[in-house]
Each structure stands twice: as structure tokens, then as C-alpha cells.
Amino acid sequence: MNYEEAVAYIEETPKFTTKNKLEHTKECLRRLGSPEERFKVIHVAGTNGKGSTCAFLTSILREAGYSCGLFTSPHLVVINERFQINEKNIDDDTFLHAFEKVKKLADELVAEGSYHPTYFEFLFLMGMVIFADAGVDYVVLETGLGGKLDATTAVEHPLACVITSISFDHMQYLGNTITAIAGEKAGIIVPGVPVIYDGNDAEAAKVISERAQELGSPYYEVKREDAEILRNTMSGIDFSFKNEYYGNTIFSIPFIAKYQVMNSMLALKTIEVMKNHISVSEDAVCRGVRETRWQGRMETVLPGVIVDGAHNEDGVEKFVETAAHFQKEYPLTLLFSAVDDKDYTDMIRTILDKISFCHVIVTQVGGYRKLPAEHLAEIFKEQGCPSAEACENVEMAFKKALEQKGEDGMLFCVGSLYLVGEIKTAILKGTRK
């Protein structure tokens, strides 16, 4: 197979299907030569903020001189984004080489009358092969869904476990209470291995800390109040982490969203906890958080154009907190879309309750999960936004939103990572011409 055929093969594997047992994933790793044992792993779970926290960790480790692999999901434009080595996407040849190894194993399993790896499991196995072959020092490993039964939990000896913000999402798989969802996420905790977690939700924090105590794992809570924000502008945020280890250090992050302060503190606390295993100077830590780049989370993609992949109510509330900060200074335009298994009515209500937009355009994304643009527009109108316009084609909707934004306004594109991916693709195609 060539690269395009390999990608097509993976994409044809059902994404939402019955998971194989974790023992099956472990057996796959064993038959691949246990690649996950050839590097140190930081395992990251959570509802929101996983990818950003992973990016902060990776950037700090890189600035400290370590080689680092990063496995995340989903991808926005190309599937290679899921595998980064030293903060760069892998090339097509590297992708194909790992694909061939995992495909050979999958064929053997099927021939034996066993199981075929799921979509995510296939990619996870590829990631472990890619990073082992590259000889990286560390891998920052993001879970796909949940934690307890996630394929990534087949890695048995992480150096640290990190659990980011927990809220309602994927309830059909993880449960419909914070306690149940937190229990799934806490499934990544390993006996004796330190866990660093977002303690802002008391219910989730209780579940995580109790699980850590049961397993004899040291646990460290980080909360929003641990930060003192000193500056918040269109170029980023300066803050101090009220923490004895970092003292009076002032950190700068290149993001405008306050929630990224929390994600960066989780990474900073993780580095502190691992201080006996790694050598990282204060300068490297400061450079690491300052130079972190992450797609799709309050990301400025063009002047005055910000995309955010918030796709659940908690994520949208955090988006609103940031976007509302700018409505006194700029006329705001909104481009919105969502898929049918999200609480899109609550998301829309949350946005409109706090922000006044000069223009609102809705479009449709997500393949078989898409919601008709007209349906979303009607909900905006029901929620008090009678001027909402529907435009089915994302590229055309983006062009229209850019025109309505004008030279002096700001355009926020939010509601789905599918939307973010299609906008970034449109920009690459030269939509602005």
C-alpha cells in the first residue's frame, strides 16, 4: 500500500465500535516487541484540556534538551498530526512504515480467528512503533476516550499520570454523572505512580484522590486559585504560579484564553513532581511554556480570527470567558457549528447569554453526525438571535464571516473540532484570495 491507501484503510475502520479488551491491546504490544517499554511515558486523561496540557509538557521537555514524542487526537487536517516527534508531525514515510508493521499484525490476528484492532487502537499501536523506532526519551500520551478501558492504558509503567478538567461529554460511553466520568478517567492511575489533577470540581477531585489513595499513588491537586494573572492581552497571558517550587517566577503563555493558565499549571506541577527523574532548568521551563503551540484551542489563525474546538458545555463556558473579554473593544462575529450527539442547544444558550455578536453564521460539519445549518440557525433564533444566517458549505460560510468581520472586528469560530479542521483546510487552500 502507498500512504493514501494506508490512510484510507485506517479511516474505513469503524471509529465508534465495541472496544477490544485491554488485554488484547497488551497482547498486540507484546507481539510488536513491547515498543512502549523503550521510552518514558507521561499519561494524560481528562475531558477538556488534555491536548493543551500535553503540548505544554512536550514543549518544556524539548527546551530541557530531551527528545519527545506526542500522541494526541483527533487530527484537524491530516492524520499525521496525531504523531509528533520533537514538536513536528511525522512524515508520510514514517507513517507508512509503522502502518505496515501494525497492518501485518492485524492480518495475522484475523487469520487466527481473533480480532482486528479498532480505529483508535490501530493508531495507538502505530504511535508506539513510531516513537520506539525514533528512539525518543519521552512520550506524552493522550487518552482517546475515558481512561480505564482506553487503549493507551495498556502502557503499564508511566512515569506520571495527569488528569485535566472533567465535565460532561461522551456520556453514552462514560456515564452521566461527574462521579462516573471521573471514575473512568481515574482508571489511568497506576499503583505508586504520582497523579497530578485538576481539582476545581470538588466531586471529580474526590473520586481521583480516593482512587490514588487506594492504589498508594502520590497525588497533587492544582486549582485555578493557584495562579495570579498579571497581564491578559491579545498577545498572551503573564501569570505567577503560587507554588513554593517555582517561587516568584513569572510565566508567559502565548494564548489569550485564561483556561490555558490552568493547563500550563498542570504541566508545571508535573515537571515539579518528576524533578528526581529529569533535569529541567528554570529557563527551560519558562521557555517551554512561552513557546508552546497548540492547534484549535483559542488559536489565532488569521489576524482577528480565532478558532476554538470547544464542543461541550464546559468548553464553551471557558470559550465565553475569554471571548467576552474582547466584546467591549471589538465588534464580534460568530461562526458556529456542532454535531448531533452534543448538547448544542445548551452551548448556544451559554454563548448568547454572555456575548453580543454583530453577526452570527451557522454551518454544518461532521459527516454522518452533522446537524443541518438551518436547524442550528433556528435554535439561535429561538434563543434570541433572529439575525442568525445558515450557510451549509463551510468554506462559503467562512468567507461570509470574514467579510462581516471587516478590518476592525474579531471573528470567533467555535462548536466543533470538525469546524476548526475545515477552516484550517480552507485557509490552506487560500480562501482569503
PLM region spans:
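Extended acidic/charged loop-beta regions that coordinate divalent cations
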Residues: P74, L123-Y173, A205-I250
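Nucleotide phosphate-binding/pyrophosphate-handling subdomain across enzymes
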Residues: D133, Y138-T143, L149-V162, I166-H170, ...
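Active-site-proximal loop/hinge segments that shape catalytic or ion-binding/gating pockets
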Residues: S416
